[in-house]
Amino acid sequence: LSNIFCIGEDLATLESSEKKSFLLNQLEAFCKKDVEPDLLDYEPIWAIGTGIEADSENIKSSVSIINDFLEQKKINTSILYGGSVSVENIHEIISIPGIEGCLVGNSSLDGEQFAIIASKITG
């Protein structure tokens, strides 16, 4: 089995400009348990299943925070993105440096949409 560690902020945290410390606290939590994730998923809570998409700048800044942490701790894992992933936004998401895949929620319920998303991810 593979473990996937999911982190992300709620809307109040995003709006309060406390996102970095919030994400770092989540990342530190798994280090305290001496657990190294096989995959790490950045999934802003406010974007899960809501249809509200995170803009690419928000995703980029979060991936940068995560990458800096992983490098500092010498943890080698892939970063995924989840949170209202759709046919409409998949190209933009996978073009963000550091994103190596996606967790697809609601869009995976439609086989045709999911196939389109999967084909864009795998190239």
Language-model-detected regions and their locations in the chain:
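Active-site loop-to-helix "anion-binding N-cap" substructures in soluble metabolic enzymes
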Residues: 1-123
